[in-house]
Swiss-Prot record:
One of its GO terms (molecular function) is magnesium ion binding. It catalyses: orotidine 5'-phosphate + diphosphate = orotate + 5-phospho-alpha-D-ribose 1-diphosphate. Its cofactor is Mg(2+). This is Orotate phosphoribosyltransferase. Pathway: Pyrimidine metabolism; UMP biosynthesis via de novo pathway; UMP from orotate: step 1/2. Pfam families: Pribosyltran. The keyword Transferase applies. Disulfide bonds: none annotated. 5-phospho-alpha-D-ribose 1-diphosphate binds at residues 114-122.
Amino acid sequence: MSNINVIDILKESDALLEGHFLLSSGRHSNRYCQCAKLLQCPQKSEKVISVIAEKLKEVDFNIIVGPAMGGVIVSYELARQTNKPGIFAERKEGVMCIRRGFEIKKGDKVIISEDVVTTGKSSLEVAKVIEEMGGEVVGIACIVDRRAEDVKTNYPIYSACKLEIETYEKDNCELCKKNIPFVKPGSREQK
C-alpha cells in the first residue's frame, strides 16, 4: 500500500482547488481540498482510504463514527476495509448527535473519521457526544490532515496525507484586501 501517492490521486480527482475560500472554521485560504470530488470515485476512494486502514491495523478500536457530511463516506469505506461497524453523527438543530438507531455503548473504542481536519472542531464535537455516551475516542482518521502546527486535538491523527495550506483570519487575508470574492465550499453553516 505504501506506493499509493495520495496527493496525485487528489489532483487527478480535481479535489485540490485554487482560489479564495471561506472555510467552515471561519478562516480564509487560497487553497481548498474538496474531498467530495475524490469520494465520488469509489475506486480512487478505496485506494486513498486503504492508506488510513493500514495505519489503523495496530490501533485497538471497535467502531467508526463519521460526522456528516464529510465523514459519512469515509466512515463507510474505512469500516468496510477494517471489518468494523461504521456509523455517522449529524446535526439536529445545530447540535451534533448520534441518531437513526445508531448507538455508542459504554466502553466502545471509537475512531472518528473525517475527510479533512483543519481545526478539529467537528471531530471534537463528535468526541464530546461519544464520551457522553460512554465511549472512548482512540483517534481521528482522515484523508487530509491540514492542521496548522498549533492546532491540537488531544487525539492521535491517522491521515492518508498531510497538506500544509495556509489560512488567514479575515482581517489578515490578502485576497480580501484585493477585493477578490470568496467561495464557501464547506458543509458547516456559517454564522
